[in-house]
């Protein structure tokens, strides 16, 4: 059974015809190769070994038919049951996959531990808006210091929240680890580009964040996570264009 | 066993001492009587008959100790296990209560039906920011038409999404119904105050929304929902002050 088949296929865009529904038993993920939210679904499918295929979508020239998969036209969307069912939103798709495939469950079964993982993820997700603000500052020095400071603050908060090796609180990564990793990976890519980056691209995020640095290295080296990630040079290249306002969703293909 | 004991107690504020932990088996909800998000937890506890007590918090003069219950100091927060456990966030507390008390489960057990209820709630929640924008327009005519139009649009979208009697898709109300009701109740209160309100306070929301009107009447008349709600005159009175910038969290007590 394939897992994440077609992850590096070119995007479908307005004018392209709608692909036929996924075959029975195959879970299709609508994706954009550099989208951190869609990557959450990819990582989960990869770690859980879900039979899956990926279709990439042009986010500036969306096909009309895509709005029948996601009413807002965003990624990710999960399509199953030969096209008859859809699940959207980056935090809901993983939980749904856990409910559907409990034998490879990543979220805890205990209600209290489960809800704490979801709440921790939401708390850690403060890194995302801080990242986008800092990214905008790359080409615009105005307010750059404040934006960098806000991003550093998000990292400091995460460093404090990381009390063991993983945000799961266990000996192996869990829901919060896998789902927040893509956001950190975006900052890692950005650290190659940002003028006076507050983070080290060599020993990311740098010596002030020893726990996060070890965590990032560990997550990054998990084969199932790597299989759901773009290589660093692709990510850096994409963001170079993105910051100029000309993202190339097929960068490197 | 009491349910929602103390729902009309006066707020605790900065300087007030921390209450002793809830007794074993009692679920404490930190609340503000007019907060639609906290009311989600109250309705769920009421419908599920969870042994519970309510402590109201002054949202402009928060007690320092409250930040140990909710790191942002917001309501709702659920406190249990004699003060040793906390669950926050208005959509997570209800799901947690369903996991904890599965015999009175409101969310569907089927994974697909469950995630669709959660996604539908998020879609319906577009009414909330539109409500706050329209409320600000009460005392400021600038941009009022656009703000009213956005709120009407949220109602039109909901009217379309309500394909049966309830957002649950079943013969009785479910997760999405109970959790979105407080937001509609706020618009109902506001319709008594708004100059040129686009909604009728007599047959709320009005003749253009026949399905929502029936839905609202039905939800409003459920005793367990009423027990978790403030009476109309209280809500209207609170919002009158709120719109002047001087909310009285103990209004009517």
UniProtKB/Swiss-Prot annotation, chains A, B:
Single GO cellular component term: cytoplasm
Gene3D superfamilies: 1.20.1050.10, Glutaredoxin
Chain sites annotated for binding glutathione: 62, 75, 89-90
Superkingdom field: Eukaryota
CDD domains: GST_N_Omega
Ranges where the GST C-terminal domain occurs: 110-238
Keywords: Oxidoreductase, Transferase
An example molecular function term from Gene Ontology annotations: glutathione dehydrogenase (ascorbate) activity
Gene Ontology biological process terms from the UniProt entry: glutathione metabolic process
EC number in record: 2.5.1.18, 1.8.5.1, 1.20.4.2
Reactions listed under catalytic activity: RX + glutathione = an S-substituted glutathione + a halide anion + H(+); L-dehydroascorbate + 2 glutathione = glutathione disulfide + L-ascorbate; methylarsonate + 2 glutathione + H(+) = methylarsonous acid + glutathione disulfide + H2O
Keyword Translocase attached: no
Residues at the active site: 35 (nucleophile)
Domain GST N-terminal span(s) in chain numbering: 25-105
Cited function: Exhibits glutathione-dependent thiol transferase activity. Has dehydroascorbate reductase activity and may contribute to the recycling of ascorbic acid. Participates in the biotransformation of inorganic arsenic and reduces monomethylarsonic acid (MMA).
Family: Belongs to the GST superfamily. Omega family.
Protein name: Probable glutathione transferase omega-2
């Amino acid at each position: 059974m394939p897992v994440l088949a077609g992850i590096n296929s070119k995007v479908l865009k307005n004018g392209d015809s709608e692909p036929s529904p996924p075959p029975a038993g195959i879970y299709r993920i609508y994706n954009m190769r550099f989208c951190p939210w869609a990557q959450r679904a990819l990582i989960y499918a990869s770690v859980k070994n879900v039979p899956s295929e990926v279709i990439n979508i042009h986010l500036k020239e969306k096909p009309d038919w895509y709005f029948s998969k996601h009413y807002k036209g965003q990624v990710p969307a999960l399509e199953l049951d030969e096209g008859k069912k859809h699940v959207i939103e980056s935090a809901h798709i993983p939980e749904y996959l856990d409910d559907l495939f409990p034998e490879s469950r990543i979220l805890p079964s205990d209600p209290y531990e489960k809800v704490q993982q979801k709440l921790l993820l939401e708390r850690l997700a403060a890194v995302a808006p801080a990242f986008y603000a800092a990214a905008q500052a790359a080409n615009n020095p105005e307010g750059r210091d404040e934006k960098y400071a806000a991003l550093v603050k998000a990292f400091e908060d995460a460093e404090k929240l990381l009390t063991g090796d993983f945000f799961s609180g266990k000996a192996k990564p869990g829901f919060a680890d896998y789902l927040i990793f893509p956001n950190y990976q975006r900052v890692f890519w950005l650290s190659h580009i940002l003028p006076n980056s507050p983070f080290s691209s060599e020993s990311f995020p740098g010596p002030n964040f020893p726990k996060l640095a070890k965590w990032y290295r560990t997550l990054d080296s998990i084969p199932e996570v790597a299989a759901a990630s773009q290589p660093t040079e692709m990510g850096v290249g994409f963001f170079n264009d993105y910051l100029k306002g000309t993202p190339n969703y097929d960068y490197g293909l």
